[in-house]
């Protein structure tokens, strides 16, 4: 189901709309430590089971969610307010995720670091593309730990 096929209630809420399920005292954090209050939209690259758990918890805390995953039956995409069905490196899909989201994260470390870098130019992104790039390369990861003094 594309966003255009979802019911109107699944669209990004208008300014000042009530967050789903009332929210919580614990908030997501955007750049410079500014909190993202319930009612904000959290974007996720990846729509697997970890993404689904993230989406459920975010919604329980009062956040809206947007998932980018090419699989039309991705577990997170099925429960998210928005499901952008495209690949991680699709420029239009990344732009749509940035448009819908107030901040973006990734479900797991195997998304292209370049996609996170693209999003980071538009929205707060965590983890950083550079951190994901290190996590994707075991030799680089070991060198990074040595440089940080980790035995």
Give the location of each predicted region.
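ATP-binding N-terminal substructure of ATP-dependent carboxylate-amine bond-forming enzymes
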Residues: 1-143
